[in-house]
Amino acid sequence: MKDYTYSVTEINEYIKDLIEGDPYLTNVSVYGEISGVRPRKGHIFFSLVEENARLECVIFGGDNMGIRLQEGRMALVEGSVSVYIPHGTYRFICSNVRYLDQAGMYQIKFETTLKKLLEEGLLSRPKKTVPRFPRKIGIITSRDSAALQDVIRTARERKAPIEIYVFHTSVQGDSAREELIKALRKANEYDLDLVMIVRGGGSKEDLWVFNEEDVIREILRLRHPVVTGIGHEIDRVIADFVADVSMHTPTGAAEYVIPDASEIHEDLDSFFEKLITSLSNRFDMEERRLETLYFRLRMIGRRKLELNEFKIERVKELAAKLRKKLMDYFEHNQKKLDSLGRMLESLNPLRPLERGFVLVKKDEKIVKESTDLKRGDVVSLVFKDGTKKAQVIG
C-alpha cells in the first residue's frame, strides 16, 4: 500500500466514502448563527458560525421550497455531512432549518452538555454519603442572597450545633461563571463535612451558570458530599444531576442537611437505649459463656481427678504385684541357695575328718591310691584338728 500512488480524485472519493459512511455525521442536528447567505441557481449556500468555528452549508432547491434565511439568526439545522469532490471540501447538506430563540438556544446547550457528561459516565458515578449530623457546612452562594438567609434562618430555628462557612460568588451575570469556579475550588481546600450550593429561583438565563460545563466539572472535583438547592420547584439545572443530593429550594436543602436539635436528642436517646440493650445482651451472652466454660472446666477437673485416682490405684496394684513377685523370687532363690549350700557342704573333703578319717597329702596333693606311695615317702596326715608328718616304712 505504501508504494501505491493515488490520484486527487481517488483521495477525495475515499474521503467522501469515509465521511458519508459515518453514522455520527449522517442525519444529525447542528446549531449556530446563520451567516453569509448566498442564493445560487435555486440553491441556498450559507455558513453556520460560532465564536471560533465555521461550517459551510447548502440547501439544494431551497428557493423552490420557499426557504428564506435571515442573517444573524440562531438556527438548528438538520442534515448530513458530505464531500464536494471537485473542490475537495466538505459541507453540510441541510434538510431542515429551525430558528431558535434564546430559550431554544439554552435548551440545545443544556441537552448537549448533559449528553456529553452522560457519555463520559459522570452522571452515573457513585454518590457520596451525606452525614446525618454534620458539624462543618460550606455554603456556596452570594453573601447578599435570600438563599443564604434561608439557610441561616433554618439553622437558627433548628438550634443545631454547626459551623457555617460561606464561599461568596455571584450566581448570575457575566462574572458568575468565573467566581463560582473560584468558590468551588476554595471550598475544596477546607475540611468540611459537606458543601451546599444554593440559589433562589429565576429565569433559565438567570440560572444558566449552573449548567456551564466547566462549572459542572468543578463540582464533580469536590471531595465533599454536595447538596444543591437551586431555584424553585420547576427549575432543574445540570448541577442537580451531579450533586449527591438535590433539593428543590435552598430551604429544602437546609432542612435536609441541618438536623433539628430535638432530632439529635431523640437519636441520642435511641442510641443510648440501643447501646444499653446491646451491652446487656452482650453481658448476658458472656455470662452464659463463662458459666458454660466453668462447668466444662469442672467436668474436666473431675474427670482428670478420677483418672488420676484410677492411675494411683493401678500403680498401687502394680507395686503390690511387683513386691509379691520379688518376695517370691527371693524366697525361691533362698531355697536354692540353701540347697546348694548343703550340697557344697556335703562335697567338702574335710567333712569326713570329723568322723575320725584322716586325709593323706603328698606334696600338697591328696593321695587317693596306696600305689601313689613308696617306702620312705614323707606325707602329711590331715586330722580334723591339725596336721602331722609321717614316713612310709612298708
UniProtKB/Swiss-Prot annotation:
Domain of life according to the entry: Bacteria
GO terms in the biological process aspect are:
DNA catabolic process
Q: Which UniProt keywords apply?
A: Cytoplasm, Exonuclease, Hydrolase, Nuclease
Q: Does the keyword Mitochondrion apply?
A: no
Question: One Pfam family name from the record?
Answer: tRNA_anti_2
CC annotations in GO: cytoplasm; exodeoxyribonuclease VII complex
Its catalytic activity? Exonucleolytic cleavage in either 5'- to 3'- or 3'- to 5'-direction to yield nucleoside 5'-phosphates
Entry's localization field? Cytoplasm
Nuclease as UniProt keyword: yes
Enzyme Commission numbers on file: 3.1.11.6
Alphabetized GO MF terms = exodeoxyribonuclease VII activity; nucleic acid binding
Kindly report, in one word, the top-level EC class recorded for this enzyme: hydrolase
Query: What the protein does?
Result: Bidirectionally degrades single-stranded DNA into large acid-insoluble oligonucleotides, which are then degraded further into small acid-soluble oligonucleotides.
Family note: Belongs to the XseA family.
Assembly: Heterooligomer composed of large and small subunits.
For this entry, the protein name equals Exodeoxyribonuclease 7 large subunit
Task: Supply the source organism for this entry.
Answer: Thermotoga maritima (strain ATCC 43589 / DSM 3109 / JCM 10099 / NBRC 100826 / MSB8)
The gene name on file is xseA
